[in-house]
Amino acid sequence: MATAMDWLPWSLLLFSLICETSAFYVPGVAPINFHQNDPVEIKAVKLTSSRTQLPYEYYSLPFCQPSKITYKAENLGEVLRGDRIVNTPFQVLMNSEKKCEVLCSQSNKPVTLTVEQSRLVAERITEDYYVHLIADNLPVATRLELYSNRDSDDKKKEKDVQFEHGYRLGFTDVNKIYLHNHLSFILYYHREDMEEDQEHTYRVVRFEVIPQSIRLEDLKADEKSSCTLPEGTNSSPQEIDPTKENQLYFTYSVHWEESDIKWASRWDTYLTMSDVQIHWFSIINSVVVVFFLSGILSMIIIRTLRKDIANYNKEDDIEDTMEESGWKLVHGDVFRPPQYPMILSSLLGSGIQLFCMILIVIFVAMLGMLSPSSRGALMTTACFLFMFMGVFGGFSAGRLYRTLKGHRWKKGAFCTATLYPGVVFGICFVLNCFIWGKHSSGAVPFPTMVALLCMWFGISLPLVYLGYYFGFRKQPYDNPVRTNQIPRQIPEQRWYMNRFVGILMAGILPFGAMFIELFFIFSAIWENQFYYLFGFLFLVFIILVVSCSQISIVMVYFQLCAEDYRWWWRNFLVSGGSAFYVLVYAIFYFVNKLDIVEFIPSLLYFGYTALMVLSFWLLTGTIGFYAAYMFVRKIYAAVKID
């Protein structure tokens, strides 16, 4: 094993490369060149709220509709995310200004919301919903200007410009509810270099919106659907009274600005919203701490093991050595098959399947191949990869099951293919029923659910059987010592050798390596933020693998020194101890970061958190188990057994 100083140069090199790739991405779609006055279509994606975690499609609210509603054909990831991309009546032409235009106005008459529609709109506003639109596949953002210096002199104020995804549906003030019924679109274009005799073309590079609430009496509309906005701040906001009908105008304006931003870097606005400096320093701190702690643990184990092996291999002192307590005394029982070997091998096979899927997804995303402009690509790739990685999960499970003296390989293969996926599908189906009851677009449609079942039983299950068949036929792992026929009596264990204490101790270091990254992941999942720091995530994943492996080795070493040879299940459970801290952090995040108070959103949060914790336990438990298994085989192969 290498020490921390041996790892440090390579770590710095890897970190420098990852810092370069963390902000790199392949755009994913070809650029669209627009000519002057070409139509730029604005589409709606969905409505989201971090308070309810229930997305809704755009026309679930009484917005103005075009003459023909057309939904975009979506991939698997978009459907699972709750996206329902649909056209809107906004008429936007390239580099053509619009001061004010009225939507869905007939003969200069305002829109009338019924009592039921008013109640629904008011409810969505109080639930803090955001509206998400796209133009040329670029999501709309609301500019926020924050001042870090509160000095009265405006010249001394430092302005920090940030962007918020989407725009707020409305706002509340003194128990009154107001709707943002006017949208001021600001689109930025980049002029492409052309030959002298060719017409200029433009590319959309940023899409902003300024939402406003303007009451009916302050808007002046004519029969040509044009309108006049009130000057300055003389207007009052458009109130929505949920107890009666409400009349209002839906209006919008369009403003174009030329920008130096090139099309290839137009997503930088959305991918640099988080405080990157804090993120970098936290990651560097985790890297340094974990590698040095891992180096210290490695040196302790190496020195202790060298001393033990040297003592055990001295022929003159062999009798004295056997009278002492130590890990060699359990050599005849250390490879004794555990209880429920089929379930253990099945869980480890699913862990291998998860490990391969996560490693490939993070690596491919780090290289920039899963662009945010390719909506749903990340989730679609993850789903298909998990299905196809079943062959590796089945192979590893089959070989381990044979090593543990198992004989019913067909039943073992079925268990591997259905145990973990069945739990995931069951939980998701129950949660989906609640989402269906709320008429949310986040509910997986029945055809998509059937397609997922077909992928499970048509791709994953046959591949697991195939891998399991070849793994079971392959030569089992060669254990260096024979197993005694009569099990050795296990002495009474100290309190700190308790399984739960081991879980708490073993989970601290791996969780400490990743909890900062976990905050950004939770923000992306539960607060509708973009996550694209996959370079850092890849580095954290490598650190997680190293720390899980070394902690697992330390824990199994101390267990064997205590003459407890029942390490198979214990090591799998203890190595996944960081999942317990993930659960604790999820509860902390729910209480302190989210404003969820209703039952169904809370159920969704903890249901998906349970899936996350289960998957993380399988992942880290599998990593630790195989590291410990290799370690145990190595140390018992290094000593002389009579």
From Swiss-Prot:
<keyword id="KW-0472">Membrane</keyword>
<feature type="transmembrane region" description="Helical">
    <location>
        <begin position="502"/>
        <end position="522"/>
    </location>
</feature>
<feature type="transmembrane region" description="Helical">
    <location>
        <begin position="417"/>
        <end position="437"/>
    </location>
</feature>
<feature type="transmembrane region" description="Helical">
    <location>
        <begin position="599"/>
        <end position="619"/>
    </location>
</feature>
<feature type="topological domain" description="Cytoplasmic">
    <location>
        <begin position="303"/>
        <end position="346"/>
    </location>
</feature>
<feature type="topological domain" description="Cytoplasmic">
    <location>
        <begin position="557"/>
        <end position="570"/>
    </location>
</feature>
<dbReference type="GO" id="GO:2000010">
    <property type="term" value="P:positive regulation of protein localization to cell surface"/>
</dbReference>
<keyword id="KW-0967">Endosome</keyword>
<feature type="topological domain" description="Cytoplasmic">
    <location>
        <begin position="471"/>
        <end position="501"/>
    </location>
</feature>
<keyword id="KW-0597">Phosphoprotein</keyword>
<keyword id="KW-1133">Transmembrane helix</keyword>
<feature type="transmembrane region" description="Helical">
    <location>
        <begin position="282"/>
        <end position="302"/>
    </location>
</feature>
<dbReference type="GO" id="GO:0070863">
    <property type="term" value="P:positive regulation of protein exit from endoplasmic reticulum"/>
</dbReference>
<feature type="topological domain" description="Cytoplasmic">
    <location>
        <begin position="398"/>
        <end position="416"/>
    </location>
</feature>
<feature type="transmembrane region" description="Helical">
    <location>
        <begin position="450"/>
        <end position="470"/>
    </location>
</feature>
<protein>
    <recommendedName>
        <fullName>Transmembrane 9 superfamily member 4</fullName>
    </recommendedName>
</protein>
<dbReference type="GO" id="GO:0005769">
    <property type="term" value="C:early endosome"/>
</dbReference>
<dbReference type="GO" id="GO:0005794">
    <property type="term" value="C:Golgi apparatus"/>
</dbReference>
<keyword id="KW-0333">Golgi apparatus</keyword>
<dbReference type="GO" id="GO:0007155">
    <property type="term" value="P:cell adhesion"/>
</dbReference>
<keyword id="KW-0732">Signal</keyword>
<dbReference type="GO" id="GO:0072657">
    <property type="term" value="P:protein localization to membrane"/>
</dbReference>
<dbReference type="GO" id="GO:0006909">
    <property type="term" value="P:phagocytosis"/>
</dbReference>
<keyword id="KW-0812">Transmembrane</keyword>
<dbReference type="GO" id="GO:0016020">
    <property type="term" value="C:membrane"/>
</dbReference>
<comment type="similarity">
    <text>Belongs to the nonaspanin (TM9SF) (TC 9.A.2) family.</text>
</comment>
<feature type="topological domain" description="Extracellular">
    <location>
        <begin position="592"/>
        <end position="598"/>
    </location>
</feature>
<feature type="transmembrane region" description="Helical">
    <location>
        <begin position="377"/>
        <end position="397"/>
    </location>
</feature>
<feature type="topological domain" description="Extracellular">
    <location>
        <begin position="368"/>
        <end position="376"/>
    </location>
</feature>
<feature type="signal peptide">
    <location>
        <begin position="1"/>
        <end position="23"/>
    </location>
</feature>
<feature type="modified residue" description="Phosphotyrosine">
    <location>
        <position position="312"/>
    </location>
</feature>
<feature type="topological domain" description="Extracellular">
    <location>
        <begin position="523"/>
        <end position="535"/>
    </location>
</feature>
<comment type="function">
    <text>Associates with proteins harboring glycine-rich transmembrane domains and ensures their efficient localization to the cell surface.</text>
</comment>
<feature type="transmembrane region" description="Helical">
    <location>
        <begin position="347"/>
        <end position="367"/>
    </location>
</feature>
<feature type="transmembrane region" description="Helical">
    <location>
        <begin position="571"/>
        <end position="591"/>
    </location>
</feature>
<dbReference type="GO" id="GO:0070072">
    <property type="term" value="P:vacuolar proton-transporting V-type ATPase complex assembly"/>
</dbReference>
<feature type="topological domain" description="Extracellular">
    <location>
        <begin position="438"/>
        <end position="449"/>
    </location>
</feature>
<dbReference type="InterPro" id="IPR004240">
    <property type="entry name" value="EMP70"/>
</dbReference>
<dbReference type="Pfam" id="PF02990">
    <property type="entry name" value="EMP70"/>
</dbReference>
<feature type="topological domain" description="Extracellular">
    <location>
        <begin position="24"/>
        <end position="281"/>
    </location>
</feature>
<feature type="topological domain" description="Cytoplasmic">
    <location>
        <begin position="620"/>
        <end position="642"/>
    </location>
</feature>
<feature type="transmembrane region" description="Helical">
    <location>
        <begin position="536"/>
        <end position="556"/>
    </location>
</feature>
